[in-house]
Amino acid sequence: MEELRQTKNFTKRDYRLSENKLFYNHSKFGNSNEIDIPFENIEGEKVSHKISNNNTLFFSVLVYIVAIALFISKINNGGDDQSVSLFWAVIATIILAFYWFNRDDFWKIKLTDNNYLYIHKNIPNKEIPENFINSLISKRNEYLKENYLIIDENLDYQSQLSNFKWLKSIGAISKIEFEEKYLELKATVNPRKTDIGFGK
């Protein structure tokens, strides 16, 4: 079973691949939640997604401005003690560091229920998450082909065609694979066949 483990700022994300689903465990400060996502629910579209708290960045800049203003004020008034401006500069730096370490850079993978699966791009490094996502999509495609890219003359034409269209729409099969299966379906199952086991 392939696994990916990611930890950042007390948050742990564990991903495990089985033969027909993805197990995802999210834990933070001892609170844990595990869900399983069937391969049928993974659309597979992957986009880059960054998360940052711009309010924290704005507040840091504001405190830096206060520190600079106090520094200039002390110089203009002939004062030598810059401890107050230095204090605010240190506070601003701490806030900026907090902002920096809480920025997240994810791969966002679309699910069928308008939810998304988030995987850190660079934890533990850039290559491992990429390889895991490739394995996820490869296993998903293999499973979906085995279970939905089949032709059964006892099943109705339209539902089987819908399966092939769905597989093509999520990238589980190529356009060429779809066209080949479509021609095979037309040759095997009567398009007008509506009842299982009976043709007209």
Named regions from a protein language model:
Residues F29-S32, N115-Y116, K126:
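Short, surface-exposed beta-strand-loop junctions and turns on beta-sheet-rich folds
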Residues S52-R103:
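Alpha-helical transmembrane spans
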Residues K121-K200:
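Charged, low-complexity cytosol-facing tails and large interhelical loops of integral membrane proteins
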